[in-house]
Regions:
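Short beta-strand-loop/turn "lid" adjacent to the catalytic site in phosphate-handling enzymes
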Residues: 72-91
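Short glycine-rich, Thr/Ser-proximal phosphate-binding strand/loop in the N-terminal lobe
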Residues: 13-62
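A short acidic Gly-Thr/Ser loop motif
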Residues: 7-12
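Short phosphate-binding loop-to-helix
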Residues: 63-74
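Extreme N-terminal starter segment of soluble prokaryotic enzymes
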Residues: 1-4
Length: 91
């Protein structure tokens, strides 16, 4: 499966959607909020193998946007079977 991760980054949050490229359907969505605060929060929802929606919420300290993005990549890798994540940076 080919997919693309679309990011919208604000001053203390990162929102994202993960799209499957053949049908342009959303296969995962979520956000990291309160970046830089003691209890940053990640909310992630995705379609499982049975095409049913699942959701998790996690909290931990995220000091900056780089660590927030790493958290997003980790949760996508944990919840989406067969997904390989490649980081691309454009400035």
């Amino acid at each position: 499966m080919k997919a693309v991760l679309v990011i919208n980054s604000g001053s203390s949050s990162i929102k994202y959607r993960f799209f499957e490229l053949e049908t342009y359907s959303v296969i995962a969505t979520g956000f990291v909020e309160r970046i830089g605060e003691a209890e940053s929060r990640l909310k992630h929802g995705w379609l499982n193998k049975e095409n049913k929606y699942e959701e998790i919420v996690e909290t931990e300290y995220v000091p900056d946007h780089g660590k927030g993005f790493d958290w997003i990549v980790d949760v996508i890798a944990r919840t989406s079977s067969g997904v390989r994540v490649h980081r691309v940076l454009e400035a």
